[in-house]
Amino acid sequence: MAGNSFGQLFRVTTFGESHGLALGAVVDGCPPGLEISEADLQIDLDRRKPGTSRYTTPRREPDEVKILSGVFEGRTTGTSIGLLIENTDQRSKDYSDIKDVFRPGHADYTYHQKYGQRDYRGGGRSSARETAMRVAAGAIAKKYLKQMHGIEITGFLSQLGPIKAEGFDAAQIEQNPFFFPDAGKLEELDQYMRDLKKEGNSVGAKVQVIATKVPVGLGEPVFDRLDADIAHAMMGINAVKGVEIGDGFAVVEQKGSEHRDEMTPAGFASNHAGGILGGISSGQDIVVSMALKPTSSITVPGKTINTEGEAIEMITKGRHDPCVGIRAVPIAEAMLALVLMDHLLRHRAQNQGVMTQTPQLR
């Protein structure tokens, strides 16, 4: 399996499985001198961890991160940062009956065909449990971005099933278990999720993440455009089936006179492009949305096959999220932070001394 690392100068490598002893990550390229502690990383890990509300999986993992290396006397040393989270609430017996069965809609079949074997306990390496380490690594990037450049990254659930956020109150996002910015829809969300759990079903969601105060100039055309790397990062998150930058697929119905973000001496008149032009950050807010599919781990009977190719009907057991989009919010924030961190270091390496007479717009 060769796809366990992400980034070039700020590079993150993760390891571990859903029901293994532990999850881990190695973070390379972090500049020295950044104040960082396990408590800093724990903030975002607590936002992502399972068992925090009745709307997510009942699996209870404390997700307590340990910094093994790369930090001395509270500051990064510039060497590899080793991170570890122990798994403590595995129930592998929940999966013994699917050892020879492919769960429809999961990675079971493709992992089996590619590698000739698979860890059937909670999906093994294909489980979203792995994303805990992305969140831990992303927390390092988020702190650097904010402390050194003033960059803030905020994610939220913009749609759950048919329920869309119509109002936006940033203060509400961390005040409810949905990361939802529209307080007027919380009761509707609660009832919808209750009904969904009674059905034994699941539903998809849309997550939006916004980065503010991003400097102009990040992105490496032509193959490492900033939007291309962001899309790559978001599509690497479990269950993500689509990514939009700015207005995304809505541009299909727009005319050029509407979509172009006109410029004045006072700044940009709009931000349909989502803060990226020609693969390079424009200095405006970077706006990213992603669509997540409904999890296939449901108690509604479904058709599948076993390893012998025989047709069977199955009901998925175990502990699962009825909507994976809820806990995807801090994951999306982390992945955007990793991309921006990597591109800041790459930009600094080649273009640090570049100056123009043109004022920077917002």
Curated annotation (Swiss-Prot):
GO terms for cellular component: cytosol. It is an enzyme of class 4 (lyase). The keyword Heme does not apply. FMN binds at residues 125-127, 238-239, 278, 293-297, 319. NADP(+) binds at residues 48, 54. Keywords: Amino-acid biosynthesis, Aromatic amino acid biosynthesis, FAD, Flavoprotein, FMN, Lyase, NADP. Pathway: Metabolic intermediate biosynthesis; chorismate biosynthesis; chorismate from D-erythrose 4-phosphate and phosphoenolpyruvate: step 7/7. The keyword Signal does not apply. GO terms for biological process: amino acid biosynthetic process; aromatic amino acid family biosynthetic process; chorismate biosynthetic process. Homotetramer. Belongs to the chorismate synthase family. This is Chorismate synthase.
